[in-house]
């Protein structure tokens, strides 16, 4: 997490040394082998042709199917159940390009979920989403990670969203690593100090919802 010019997306690519996935170097894995282990959720899907929502979600099974092999009935039922789980019930036959931006992003998230990959990479997935959809998306992501003992690496702009949904925050400044924050264990004073060094003076408040759950809210102390 950092401002727009902090080269977050660049940091997703190794600049030196080797990158390992399940004890294998990325160079040793074919595109299909890599896709079987890793799912990717971009800022925008890039889908411009008319496809049904179900067809888009079924793309998540592509690495597991042989050439020209169609998805099985079980895969289709799982895809429909996943759409219901993320809040898009009865939308499977709707044109994907007619969805709102928030619904599109949830659909792409469902596409990643059906493949049950152990590693998910998300590049600013919340950038085009409103408050409701961005929180909904991150809660679904956290549920998936817990249920499948998976790992999600996410680049984010919203510090409050990151503080309340991520286990570990890696803070970048001008393309370099500034420090880490573990929201459940890092003292508030240390979080404020680190985040103030990149956002200007901020305060972090602890609030509780009606169910007693604690939330961290970052407040800008001075105007920019």
What are the residue ranges of the model-derived segments?
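Conserved ABC transporter NBD signature motif
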Residues: 17-25, 33-34
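Conserved ABC ATPase "signature" region
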Residues: 58, 73-91, 116
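Conserved ABC ATPase signature
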Residues: 95-99
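Catalytic Walker B motif of ABC-type/P-loop ATPase nucleotide-binding domains
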Residues: 120-124
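H-loop/switch region of ABC-family ATPase nucleotide-binding domains
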Residues: 156-157
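H-loop (His-switch) and adjacent beta-strand-loop-beta switch element
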Residues: 169-186
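ABC ATPase nucleotide-binding domains
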Residues: 191-224
């Amino acid at each position: 997490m950092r401002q727009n010019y902090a080269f977050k997306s660049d940091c997703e690519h190794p600049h030196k040394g080797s990158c390992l996935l399940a004890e294998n170097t990325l160079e040793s894995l074919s595109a299909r082998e890599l896709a079987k282990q890793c799912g990717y959720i971009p800022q925008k899907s890039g889908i411009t042709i008319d496809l049904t929502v179900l067809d888009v979600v079924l793309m998540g099974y592509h690495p597991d199917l042989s050439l020209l092999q169609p998805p099985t009935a079980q895969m289709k039922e799982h895809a429909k159940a996943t759409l219901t789980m993320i809040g898009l019930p009865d939308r499977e036959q709707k044109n994907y390009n007619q969805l709102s931006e928030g619904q599109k992003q949830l659909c792409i998230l469902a596409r990643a979920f059906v493949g049950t990959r152990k590693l998910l990479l998300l590049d600013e997935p919340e950038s085009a989403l409103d408050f409701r959809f961005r929180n909904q998306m991150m809660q679904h992501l956290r549920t998936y990670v817990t249920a499948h003992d998976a790992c999600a690496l996410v680049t984010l702009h919203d510090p409050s969203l990151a503080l309340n949904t991520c286990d570990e925050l890696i803070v970048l400044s001008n393309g370099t690593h500034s420090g880490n924050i573990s929201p459940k264990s890092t003292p508030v004073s240390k979080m404020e100090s680190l985040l103030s060094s990149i956002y200007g003076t901020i305060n972090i408040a602890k609030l509780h919802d009606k169910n007693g759950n604690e939330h961290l809210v970052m407040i800008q102390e001075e105007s920019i």
